[in-house]
Amino acid sequence: MFFVLSISAQSENEAIKNIMTRTSIRKYTDQPVSKADIETLLRAGMAAPTAVNKQPWHFVAVTDKAKLKELSGGRGGMLEQCALAIVVCGNMEKTMQGKGQEFWIQDCSAATENILLAAHALGLGAVWTGGYPMEERVASISKALKLPETIIPLCTIVIGHPAERPTPKDKWKPENVSYNEFGGK
């Protein structure tokens, strides 16, 4: 038996509503993100589940405009117009200790999604941009942030006050779901 919230129940549940209405925002105003909001975003990231509670992450919050430009690699765009970027990194010293060594990407991805949802809940816009495993991006981000070899950038979350409000898309596709076994209805 599967429990599914009706559409009306979904719209009344704030957590579900936040998930269903989050969209990628790529255009931002000049307004800075407050230190309190930055800490809230980082706390949300650190609240993510991790394999064997390893918490194998390190976050770099970037607000300096020159550093944001350097992170953009001279390509301009989102990183140069945003107020904040949070680079989510895996800490290999933590990752390689004990059990759960293979799970740092999943753990840091869960933290990334928490930050994206927290940004939306705070009225901020955000978009997830990839880093790892693209060697050129990893090297560029690592150089810009002076990361030690044991800290690997997974992704950069570009964040700011939205200058656009795209309509959320309903991405539900029942053909992408099976029950009990592949192809099960």
Language-model segments: residues:
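Bacterial N-terminal signal peptides
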Residues: 1-6
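Acidic, surface-exposed loops and disordered segments
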Residues: 7-185
